[in-house]
Amino acid sequence: MANSNLPRRIIKETQRLLSEPAPGISASPSEENMRYFNVMILGPTQSPYEGGVFKLELFLPEEYPMAAPKVRFLTKIYHPNIDKLGRICLDILKDKWSPALQIRTVLLSIQALLSAPNPDDPLSENIAKHWKSNEAEAVETAKEWTRLYASGA
């Protein structure tokens, strides 16, 4: 770990992520930049994303922990709170961020969002409309996208 200029907090959080990974989540720092993490989240059971492996990138800005990490999905996903660029609509990544939160909390919250899509606070209007007008069909589309784009990522 080339961590010469990293704040202690980032080093400690990284060590904990590696030694005690959260169930269904792996996050490993890049060799070149310890503020950049390659993340994999398994689709939660009993969700439309079950069986999927979703790749994300997480970046800790210079201001971290005073500013939230930047996180986005690299794997295509059909979800009302995630747009086609992989950006995530999650309160703790925006106005509800607190320095008391950690990388682990953020990743667990994203995993929970996969279990409980919220079409009332959408990032993708079209998917949210689909979810609200015909949830069963939207869930089927999400399952199909999971099979197409997230199987064995």
UniProtKB/Swiss-Prot annotation:
One of its GO terms (biological process) is protein ubiquitination. The keyword Nucleotide-binding applies. Pfam families: UQ_con. It comes from the Eukaryota. The active site is at C89. Belongs to the ubiquitin-conjugating enzyme family. Interacts with yeast and human Mms2, with the RING domain of RGLG2 and with UEV1A, UEV1B, UEV1C and UEV1D. This is Ubiquitin-conjugating enzyme E2 36.
